[in-house]
Amino acid sequence: MSIFEQLSNNKGNISSALGKALAQKVLQENQMDILLECIDLASYQALATASRHIRSGAAKVVEIVAEKQPGWVAPQLDKLLPALSVQEPQTRWAIIRVMGFCACLNKSVALQAIAFAEKYIEDKQGLCLASSTDLFLGDLGAISREDAQKVFPLLEQSIESSIENEQDWLLEASYKLFGNLDQSEQAEVLQFAQRWQYSSRKNTQQRARQILRLS
């Protein structure tokens, strides 16, 4: 069965398992043809609701590979930009995360994704998309002081409009770019971390205190 056919039947729990299985074939067996096909399929029939399972499944494969081997995906990053405009959030959150994983290797394309991140923050559609967007901003802002200046206003906006349980990812993103912020910006991040250092959630406490140790 072809990759396209497998992804066409890609739904529910099968979707997650299939994405992981295909990604492992790329990572462990160097089946780069799978990766290249999934990059193309991440924006397949972008306006068609019926094709959303194909797009989201392909995007998941690309995300898993990009996390482990960003250099394999970075040269093709421009082909993934159209996937940031598709209707289903599953595809968008996977690909905005890919943009972060590959940002330091193909910054010119990753910078183009900022416009999409801005839209996602203005209209937050669930925790997965919001958190992936936050982490993208952190990854991009971690590259340089100049890049941090581009993304920090958006991260501030995301903090101000945070949704339930988003704080962990906002803290992680803030930690990533903290060293590239000026003193006043760092003070804002520290104030945000102080709000969460005594959270009832241990993971949140750890992330907050990780930032506070930088002061």
Each predicted region: which residue ranges?
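Extended alpha-helical scaffolding segments
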Residues: 140-143, 157-203
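Structural signature of alpha-helical solenoid repeat scaffolds
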Residues: 63-64, 100, 138-139, 175-179, ...
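N-terminal alpha-helical scaffold/docking segments in eukaryotic complex subunits
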Residues: 1-68, 198, 202-215
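Structural signature of alpha-solenoid helical repeat scaffolds
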Residues: 46, 50, 83, 87-88, ...
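Hydrophobic, well-structured mid-protein blocks that either form specific transmembrane helices
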Residues: 84-132
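Structural detector for tandem alpha-solenoid helical repeats, activating at a conserved register
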Residues: 17, 33, 53, 75, ...
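Amphipathic alpha-helical scaffolding segments comprising HEAT/armadillo-like alpha-solenoid repeats
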Residues: 1-5, 29-43, 70-83, 107-121, ...
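HEAT-repeat alpha-solenoid elements in large eukaryotic scaffold proteins
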Residues: 3-18, 47-60, 89-96, 126-134, ...
